[in-house]
């Protein structure tokens, strides 16, 4: 049996909004994000991470439309969609919304690489073009080094050179039928930038009893702020230009509270409920500058999320290529994020391989000092585009 490889890339920096995402897509993304976050954290103990569950959804949705039977039902359940019509409607709308974003650099690109001699199923070709705005290219996978370079060059171009070497040539062979690639890149700026002159090295608690020095940014400003007893944490929302996207930071009250926080975040409604009680107030904000890169083996992660059948030899992916039944042999995500005084920049890439984002106050400002491990999420119009934890 021929195989498919799925690759995911995401690049994001201080973003503006995707509008009118329906509850179906938002709820599906919230649940998928919470589950994927839990698994990626589990696989990276004691490490800072960045991931984008949002970028995994389009390839999985494409595979759902290309599959039958139990594989089809398993994929629909995983991404939280009731049927194929909902996939077509929601992702077509999302693609249009992304292309209409003004004032920031925001790109979302999809591409399907098909083995020489292979041809997309006519219906899948139409859906790929009209729903996912996906390009198609035939390629000789037996020339694995040349094929990998071609795919990696496309990924670099669509993530502003932030994601490199996504595909290992050794993962490609004459048995490779197709490679599904998704890339997202975003770049923007804070609504109100941090002053670089106020950035200084300050203590950061990597554990309850151990500190290191990190470059800590500082700004006094008007932010949405809240506290949650359920999360045992402070929350702050830092807006990007356009005020439709923001960075949410959830800071445990205890120096060693990150594990408890991660456990609470398994329920996506917990964070949503905490955000609903946030209010505007003056805050003294201390936030580390940081840069994180994470590579995730999505085959392991998805399997732990009960997405298994696409990896089996009897995967029933029969509507992607004409006359060929396929399975997924490899699924990889590379992700990148950088937070600094100007804003944020992040990148991620995914690949699936198949075989045949002044007021006067009577009280002093609230202090939000992110000097211990914390959770962050970049939201666009209330939808989590990528998230992670910063530990050191």
UniProtKB/Swiss-Prot annotation:
Pfam families with a match to the protein in the record: Serpin
User: Tissue-wise, where is it found?
Assistant: Hemolymph.
Q: Which SUPFAM superfamilies match?
A: Serpins
Q: Name one GO cellular component term.
A: extracellular space
Key words, A-Z: Protease inhibitor, Secreted, Serine protease inhibitor, Signal
Q: Where is this site: Reactive bond?
A: 359-360
Recorded GO molecular functions are: serine-type endopeptidase inhibitor activity
Q: What is known of its domains?
A: The reactive center loop (RCL) extends out from the body of the protein and directs binding to the target protease. The protease cleaves the serpin at the reactive site within the RCL, establishing a covalent linkage between the serpin reactive site and the active site of the protease. The resulting inactive serpin-protease complex is highly stable.
Describe the family membership recorded for this protein in Swiss-Prot or TrEMBL.
Belongs to the serpin family.
Annotated function: May play a role in the prophenoloxidase activating system in the silkworm hemolymph.
Q: Which PANTHER family does the record cross-reference, listed alphabetically?
A: GH10112P-RELATED (PTHR11461:SF211), SERINE PROTEASE INHIBITOR, SERPIN (PTHR11461)
In Swiss-Prot or TrEMBL terms, this protein is called Antitrypsin
